[in-house]
Amino acid sequence: MASLYSQGFELYPTPLHMENYILETMHSNVLYFLVEKYGKIVSLASAEMDPKNRNAEITDCLTIPSERGKGHMKELIRALEKELSERSFLTFYTLCRASAPGINAAFSSLGYAFTGRLVNNCRIGNGFEDMNIWCRML
């Protein structure tokens, strides 16, 4: 997972390129789900959980270029939502790159409401990027 994240994101707000970081978060408040094809990870996403307030951020979404447009991310988001709802979570949200139409389309098609844009909010890749906020309540 760390290797795929390091290939997919040149810069990222959290150290997903470090295996120890991923393992540490797995044992705290983060769920990681993935799609494999022929024994290789082709898509992955996570949910950072806030159990006290029963909300979770769907984040760290990545699909390798050759597998984009095949519905993997929507499958992962649905699976994360199912797991979270079984744990009594009521609200899901995400901040995703405004410049990435695929991930925005995925959240929109799954019934998330666009609630705004944070301008120059997150340092990913070559600089600061605008981030769209999407929310869904059960």
How would you describe each model-predicted region?
Residues 84-97:
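Conserved GNAT acetyl-CoA-binding A-motif
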Residues 135-138:
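Short beta-strand-to-coil "C-cap" segments at the C-terminal boundary of structured domains/repeats
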Residues 93, 113-128:
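Conserved catalytic-core motifs of GNAT/GCN5-like acyltransferases
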Residues 6-65:
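A conserved beta-strand-loop-helix scaffold within acyl/acetyltransferase catalytic domains
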Residues 30, 129-133:
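Short hydrophobic/aromatic beta-strand or adjacent loop that forms the aromatic wall/cage
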Residues 94-104, 121-122:
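Conserved beta-strand-loop-alpha-helix junction that forms the acyl-donor binding cleft
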Residues 63, 69-84, 105, 109:
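Conserved acetyl-CoA-binding loop-helix of GNAT-fold acetyltransferases
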